[in-house]
Every structure is written in C-alpha cells, then in structure tokens.
Amino acid sequence: MSPSFLVLLTILGPGNSLQLQDPWGHETKEAPGPVHLRERRQVVGDDDFEDPDYTYNTDPPELLKNVTNTVAAHPELPTTVVMLERDSTSAGTSERATEKIATTDPTAPGTGGTAVGMLSTDSATQWSLTSVETVQPASTEVETSQPAPMEAETSQPAPMEAETSQPAPMEAETSQPAPMEADTSQPAPMEAETSQPAPNEAETSKPAPTEAETSKPAPTEAETTQLPRIQAVKTLFTTSAATEVPSTEPTTMETASTESNESTIFLGPSVTHLPDSGLKKGLIVTPGNSPAPTLPGSSDLIPVKQCLLIILILASLATIFLVCTVVLAVRLSRKTHMYPVRNYSPTEMICISSLLPEGGDGAPVTANGGLPKVQDLKTEPSGDRDGDDLTLHSFLP
C-alpha cells in the first residue's frame, strides 16, 4: 500500500475505502469479464478513465460501480478519488498503469471508444504530476496549484463541469469544494438547474467527454498523440465557456438557451436534456401568464358591458313610464275641477224680446220687479227707447 493510497482511505472514510481497496488492489482479477467500451477507451489511454468507467451501466460484479455511485451522489469525491487512485498507479511508471489496464480490458461493444482512449492516454502522465498534491484534503486547491495538465485532469473526472459552463481554472479560483457547487454558484437559478444535471450525467455516463471529442476529431486525435495539444484545446474550451457564463448569467431564460446550445458542441446528446427542461419551464411560464389572464379579463369585461347596457335601457323605460303617468294624472285632475260655463244662444234673446210688452198693453213688469213709468202722450215717441232699456236691464245682473 502506498502512503498516498492510505491518505485516500483516511479522507474518504471506511465505507468508501473498502470499496476502493478491492478494485484497485486487484485490477486484473476483477475485470476478467467483458467491459464496456468506456473501459476500452481507458485501455487506449491511461488510468484517467478508470474512474469514469464506473458508471451505472457497468457489470454488477465489478465494485467500481459502487465507487461511481458515491461519486455521483457527492461531486467532491470523484475528483479526490480519481486523483488518489491515479496517484497509486502513478507511483509506478505510466507504462505500468497502461499495461494493467490492457490486461483488464476484454473486447466489448460500446460507443465512442476512440475518444475515451485519447483522454486516457493524457491522464496517465498527468496524474503522475499530481500525485504529490492529491494528498491534500481539498481537491480544488490541488487543481489551482497545478498547471495546464491539471485542467485536463479536472475535465476528465468531471467532464461536464470543465466543458459545459465553467473551466478548471474557474473552479480553482472559486475554491469551491464541489464542482456541483461551482455550477450552483451562478446567480441565475435556471443556470444552476441546467448545469447541475449536466455534471451528474457526465459522471454517471462518461461518454460525454468522448462525444465532445468525437464532435471535433482533429484536436482529439492530436490529444492521443500529444499532451500539450489536449491542454491547449481544453483551455480554449474552458475559456470560451467561462466567457459565455458571465454574459448569460443576468437573464435566466437566455442562459438556459445559450448555455445549452453552446454546451451541445462539447457534450453532444447529454446536453439535449437541458434545453428540453429549460424550454418546458419557459413554456409553462409564458402561456400561463399571457393568454390566461387576457382571456378571463376579456370574458369579464363583456358581461359587464352587457349588464350596463341592460340597466340603462331599463332605467330609460322606467323614466318614460313615470313621465307618462304624471302627465295623464294632471290632465285628469284638470278635467274634474273645470266649472261649466253658461252659453246663451241668440234664439233665447229673441224669445225674451218677444215677450216684452209693446206700447200700452198694460203695465208690464220690469225685470227688476219695478213698475214701468206712466208715460204721457207726449212721451209716446220715446217708448221704443224704454223698451230697449228694459231689454238691456234684463240681461244685466
């Protein structure tokens, strides 16, 4: 047992140490059966992808699955475990590590074997550089002190982290204990949600880095043969991702769209889940807010207008009815209080005049009840005037 491996056991605890001792102590014995293409990728490379090979899809007898499960649950562990385990292998020569992997690798069907092999070749020499620093409890601090090769190492145990939104130097500067925390440190909530599942998928199913390499065959082939090119390409990827992250952080929906689109270049199908979730969330928010309130608002306004019109019509009818009743009542009251007026026809006057005495036919009774004056013979010619006066007096009150 090397001292670095003992330090690994003390850091991870008894449960994790037991799981790690068996697979690393007997690498050749525990991998006799067929292994996934991810392990074939590791055979092409060095010990770098032995840690990512322990995905949920590996065979049940292998104990490496348990190690990967713990790593997926706790993102801090995968970096430390990979570094220490690789340190134990890096204590020997890089060639020795490659030989052990070759013995463990049987041919098995898988995807993206060439890309994984490229990364694994780079990791063997790089882990030998980091063997001294991995003893430190904080894996992120070790990454800060290490040069460009360390960037390649950090991207391999957690490929989604380095390639998606935050490069290895960004994680070192933030000095965050877990890569998941580095993703969640972004102010935009949608970014945290989208970036968090990305590292989980990358750790559980390690074909993500291989797909990234397959999408760009020229730099990946260079990686298989030359280590500095790997570092340069990865630094470019991480710097571009780092520059894209702050620009997309202020807007939540834009970050989800831009990060997912740009990360697909590196991650491939693993990122396809992210834009779907982001778009679904956006769709759930926007249709609920825009059409829903407008429809009920318009439906509410229409009945109100109709009710107002009906009320106005009824009010106008009521006023007309009241006015008509008042007018009719006034007219009826006037008719009842009218007094009859006597109308004297000319025929009646004629009858009265005919009844008056003419000349000396006795002493007629005047209308006032007085006797007419006795007229002398001299006054006979004025008899007509007296008769006229009597007729006039008869009409006077």
Curated annotation (Swiss-Prot):
Ranges of compositional bias, category Polar residues: 120-198, 236-261
Impact noted for substituting N261A: No effect on P-selectin binding
Cytoplasmic domain ranges by topology: 329-397
Residues spanning the signal sequence: 1-17
Subcellular location: Cell membrane
This protein's GO CC annotations: plasma membrane
Residue numbers bearing the Phosphoserine modification: S394
UniProt-reported outcome of changing N66T: No effect on P-selectin binding
Ranges of compositional bias, category Basic and acidic residues: 375-390
InterPro entries: PSGL-1
Keyword Membrane tagged: yes
Topology, Extracellular side: 18-307
Location of the region described as Disordered in the Swiss-Prot/TrEMBL record: 89-261, 364-390
GO biological process: one example: leukocyte tethering or rolling
Post-translational modification Sulfotyrosine, affected residues: Y54
Keywords for the protein's UniProt record, in alphabetical order: Cell adhesion, Cell membrane, Cleavage on pair of basic residues, Disulfide bond, Glycoprotein, Membrane, Phosphoprotein, Repeat, Sialic acid, Signal, Sulfation, Transmembrane, Transmembrane helix
Documented effect of changing T58A: Greatly decreased P-selectin binding and tethering and rolling of cells. No further reduction in P-selectin binding. Binding of P-selectin completely abolished
Phosphothreonine: residues carrying this PTM: T391
Residues the record marks as carrying a glycan: T58, N66, N261
Stretches forming Sequence repeats: 126-135, 136-145, 146-155, 156-165, 166-175, 176-185, 186-195, 196-205, 206-215, 216-225
Subunit structure, as described in the record: Homodimer; disulfide-linked. Interacts with P- and E-selectins, through their lectin/EGF domains. Interaction with P-selectin requires sialyl Lewis X glycan modification and tyrosine sulfation, probably on Tyr-54, for high affinity binding. Dimerization appears not to be required for P-selectin/SELP binding. Interacts with SNX20. Interacts with MSN and SYK; mediates SYK activation downstream of SELPLG. Interacts with HAVCR1.
Function: A SLe(x)-type proteoglycan, which through high affinity, calcium-dependent interactions with E- and P-selectins, mediates rapid rolling of leukocytes over vascular surfaces during the initial steps in inflammation. Critical for the initial leukocyte capture.
Descriptive protein name: P-selectin glycoprotein ligand 1
Species: Mus musculus (Mouse)
Gene: Selplg
